[in-house]
Amino acid sequence: GKLAIRVDAQGWGGGDARQIKTVLEAVAGELLSKFPGRPLAPIRVSRSTQAPVALYERGPGGEIRIELTASGPDAGPYVYEFSHEFCHVLSNYERHPHHAVTRNHQWFEEALCEVASLYTLKTLALSWQKAAPSAELAAAARQLRTSVQTLESATHAAWSTGVPDDALANATPYLQAFGH
């Protein structure tokens, strides 16, 4: 069956919870299509002022809890953040021992989840251009393409020297701007 996603009704800074739910369902549908038959508990999505996160602690009904910092009516930040956090869920993040960050390998999961965000932004931009779930999201296709271009140019700029430490220093403002 379809993955159940519940979005908190309030706190989205002008974003409509029903529209946000439609966006998140599109993200989940795209990524879950790569994991046929993968069962998942329902997901509850809330707004956070701290950082986007897939929480280790389940909700009272056993639901997976994801917090996003995205707000407002633009779909791009929701696609980007939810893709990243949902990727953590799909990569069995909850199996880390005592939910400790696995320092030696966490970078790989983070890189994979960034790729998932870029992939989903690109894929939804293309599919919404042809057949969006709503008129508002048809208009958002261009904005998603712009988000992809911004992220890709920031990545290229960050690696301009070819030195990993420089890349991290150059990427820090971009990561902070996108909630990391």
Could you say what each language-model-derived stretch is?
Residues 79-97, 110, 114, 118:
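Active-site recognition of the HExxH zinc-binding catalytic motif
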Residues 20, 24, 79, 105, ...:
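Hydrophobic (often cysteine-bearing) scaffold residues that line and stabilize catalytic clefts
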Residues 2-73:
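Auxiliary, metal-adjacent structural segments of Zn-dependent hydrolase domains
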Residues 154-180:
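Pan-zinc metallopeptidase signature
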Residues 13, 17-20, 24, 133, ...:
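Intrinsic-disorder-associated interaction segments
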Residues 29-36, 91, 95, 117-126:
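Sec-exported extracytoplasmic/periplasmic mature domains
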Residues 103-155:
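Post-HExxH zinc-binding segment in Zn-dependent metallohydrolases
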Residues 65-82, 96-105:
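Short pre-active-site segment immediately N-terminal to the catalytic Zn-binding motif
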